[in-house]
Swiss-Prot record:
Top-level taxon: Bacteria
Binding site for [4Fe-4S] cluster: 581, 584, 589
GO cellular component: cytosol
Residues that bind Zn(2+): 437, 501
Protein name: Phosphomethylpyrimidine synthase
Involved pathway(s): Cofactor biosynthesis; thiamine diphosphate biosynthesis
A Pfam family hit: ThiC_Rad_SAM
UniProt subunit comment: Homodimer.
């Protein structure tokens, strides 16, 4: 029975079973490896795909094989991808970064929560059954201290997080010796800096320049360090979160784990339903990747969904609440200014961003400037105290092809550039959010405008969707735009699922969105010429030409679907060693024919060579031994 036919109670029970039985799991024929850094507790996880040997000759009784190197790949699954790690969602993940945070001695534990709302929730006994039991005592910067990775980078300090990232971004490609696998086409990088080897110093320099961010709240020590920047691998974000009509805590934790398994580099919790606070705590304590939020959503819930009733005080309390839970980055729609709202009146689809529409309504109802803009420096002070990165929201992004690249969109973008410089005054890390719905020929301008207006801060886009005619397939329409803008320099792509514009995504939708966007991100890395990006493609092509079916499945982004499609028509074990598939059959397989041509050409070359030598022998008189002067 599919999840779409399950009742709400059945869906929740299924999610609870998933959590209760959760174990570390490796992909088929893969194993978890750890690459160590300069200190013993820097252990960077990667997945190594084991490959079978290639048959190169010999006889049936005595075949000769050539080994194929294992292929290391980037792994976002954290402890969930390691069969040796015991998983207990009730206890949460190990606090990987806690020793590094403590060693810096620039933060301190709080005696009480700073948020009045958090204190109210903790005092409510009726929430005991929902509450995560292993609550952390929150930390914040000591007086006069700054705890951000940008602050350290500007001081010339290479943190353990930066070294971890350098190792991770290299993807273990130094382990590969095969020239066939190492071959790579030169890319077109549009001005990106892509060194052959990423060093901790390079990471530090990129962060110091504001070209990259490391989302790493000191209250989320469970997260594995990662980086977002155009001079690094293109990253993918997955959105999860409940709504007023569907989903539960169990289902959101399940979606979190599922997202990291299928390659989410970060996850945004966009919950708008009941128990937002409790749901987020469960997610953070069990997340190996950075978690982002849109705080205005929860602030709106606190005023019963009435945008006009929002206040700076309620929003500030929400920031403190989420900061002390461990949220790694905030989307803040501070660029939706009162004077920009009329620009959207002539649009076909108006303001489609939830956060943007909330702030636009507030501005119009009070005829005041956006309080997020007015209080932006105070927002930066909060972020600096916990190392929360800012994701400056594109509240005026286009919601249709017709509205792409209009005055409202780019006016807001220019304001985001001004806000970026203010955030940098506080050593707060910044990335910029982008559209939206943009046809292919108008996408590159978005990237060039962002780099110029926002001082090369990382760009983070939703797609963009390249056409509006395909509800149910918007992971395709947006995946096209995502691949293009990733190539042009976008640092992180926010996935779109098949349910976009239609409903809240379920577990399978999350997977489909992530696979689509991992394809887009990887295609962008290839096009940029990112060092090592082609290794997996080369390994796949070699396996395909040699009819190593098991290796083809295991090298795929989704081994299970690849195997299932193959086995629909050739389910027998013999089909997995056959030199053909059901598309062409045994007589018309182009690769089989190519192999035969290659073998024939090699045999012909030997025959021609022997004939040449024979003719040469006869031309020299047919003597077995030549005279010294003839040698």
């Amino acid at each position: 029975m599919s999840t779409t036919t399950l009742t709400r109670r059945e869906q929740r029970a299924k999610a609870q079973h998933f959590i209760d039985t959760l174990e570390g799991t490796a992909f088929p024929n893969s194993k978890r490896i750890y690459v160590t850094g300069s200190q013993h507790d820097i252990r960077v996880p990667m997945r190594e795909i084991q490959l079978s040997p290639t048959l190169i000759g010999g006889s049936k009784d005595n075949p000769q094989f050539e080994e194929n190197e294992a292929v290391p790949v980037y792994d976002t699954s954290g402890p969930y991808g390691d069969p040796e790690v015991a998983i207990n969602v009730q206890q949460g993940l190990a606090k990987l970064r806690q020793p590094w945070i403590d060693a810096r001695n620039d933060s301190e534990e709080l005696d009480d929560r700073s948020s009045a709302y958090t204190r109210e929730r903790l005092a409510d006994d009726g929430l005991d059954d929902l509450r995560f039991t292993g609550l952390l005592t929150p930390k914040r910067a000591k007086a006069g201290k700054c705890v951000t990775q940008l602050h350290y980078a500007r001081k010339g300090i290479i943190t353990p997080e930066m070294e971890f990232i350098a190792i991770r971004e290299n993807m273990g490609r130094e382990r590969i010796r095969s020239e066939v696998l190492r071959h790579q086409h030169p890319g077109m990088n549009f001005g990106a800096r892509l060194p052959e080897n990423i060093t901790p110093e390079f990471v530090r320099d990129e962060v110091a320049a504001g070209r990259a961010i490391i989302p790493a709240n000191i209250n989320h020590p469970e997260s594995e360090p990662m980086i977002i920047g155009r001079n690094f691998l293109v990253k993918v974000n997955a959105n999860i979160g409940n709504s007023a009509v569907t989903s539960s805590i169990e289902e959101e934790v399940e979606k979190l784990v599922w997202s990291t398994r299928w390659g989410a580099d970060t996850v945004m919790d966009l919950s708008t339903g009941r128990y937002i606070h409790e749901t987020r705590e469960w997610i953070l304590r069990n997340s190996p990747v950075p978690i982002g939020t849109v705080p205005i959503y929860q602030a709106l819930e606190k005023v019963n969904g009435i945008a006009e009733d929002l206040t700076w005080e309620a929003f500030r309390d929400t920031l403190l609440e989420q900061a002390e839970q461990g949220v790694d980055y905030f989307t803040i729609h501070a660029g939706v200014l009162l004077r920009y709202v009329p620009m959207t009146a002539k649009r076909l689809t108006g303001i489609v961003s939830r956060g943007g529409s909330i702030m636009a309504k507030w501005c119009l109802s009070h005829h005041k400037e956006n309080f997020l803009f007015e209080h932006f420096r105070e927002i930066c002070e909060i972020c600096a105290a916990y190392d929360i990165s800012l994701s400056l929201g594109d509240g005026l992004r286009p919601g249709s092809i017709q509205d792409a690249n209009d005055e409202a969109q780019f006016s807001e973008l220019h304001t985001l550039g001004e806000l970026t410089k203010i955030a940098w005054e506080y050593d707060v890390q910044v990335m910029i959010e982008g559209p939206g719905h943009v046809p292919m020929h108008m996408i590159q301008r978005n990237m060039t405008e962002e780099l110029e207006s926002c001082h090369e801060a990382p760009f983070y886009t939703l797609g963009p969707l390249t056409t509006d005619i395909a509800p149910g397939y918007d992971h395709f329409t947006s995946g096209i735009g995502a691949a293009m803008i990733g190539w042009f320099g976008c640092a992180m792509l926010c996935y779109v699922t098949p349910k976009e514009h239609l409903g809240l995504p379920n577990k399978e939708d999350v997977k489909q969105g992530l696979i689509t966007y991992k394809i887009a991100a990887h295609a962008a890395d290839l096009a940029k010429g990112h060092p090592g990006a082609q290794i997996r493609d080369n390994a796949m092509s070699k396996a395909r030409f040699e009819f190593r079916w098991e290796d083809q499945f295991n090298l795929a982004l989704d081994p299970f679907t690849a195997r299932a499609y193959h086995d629909e028509t050739l389910p027998q074990e013999s089909g997995k060693v056959a030199h053909f598939c059901s598309m062409c059959g045994p007589k018309f397989c182009s690769m089989k024919i190519s192999q035969e041509v290659r073998d024939y050409a090699a045999a012909q070359a030997i025959e021609v060579g022997m004939a040449d030598m024979s003719e040469n022998f006869r031309a020299k008189g047919g003597e077995i031994y030549l005279k010294r002067e003839e040698v």
